């Protein structure tokens, strides 16, 4: 469990499952994903998250805003080994009602710190579809840098059903860059 200035980043509980299923069934939240998730698929994702935590000691946190909401979504680190062996991404998915408060930026900044300082990662990446401007802004605000040479067609996106979601832009940050820039990056500077 980690406390940031406004957030509690914690392991998942069964009480999070209803809110997570609602988030995954929201077309606004899932606009840049391959459709909505059923309750069964949403619960299976939580199970995978918890299994990963048990095996590795890190993963996607449930995000709580104490005094405001017991669950607003997730932020954290997740393997992206379908791109390259050992590659880890920082990612987030928050309920639309909580967008625009800086929660994703605040929590993702902490995820980078944990990834570099506690897990010992050499690099953390993130990626999304080009049209996902909100997520791209978060990536840039936490210090990730766009690497056009890394842009790719996502191997897990169905190109027939979701051709507009195949192409992805790629961002990265090394541990050395993080240590050099960490003091100058502040989530409080940004409204997302």
Predicted feature residues:
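Conserved GNAT-fold acetyl-CoA-binding loop/helix
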Residues: 28-50, 58-59
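Short glycine/serine/proline-enriched coil/turn segments at secondary-structure junctions
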Residues: 52-55, 82-84
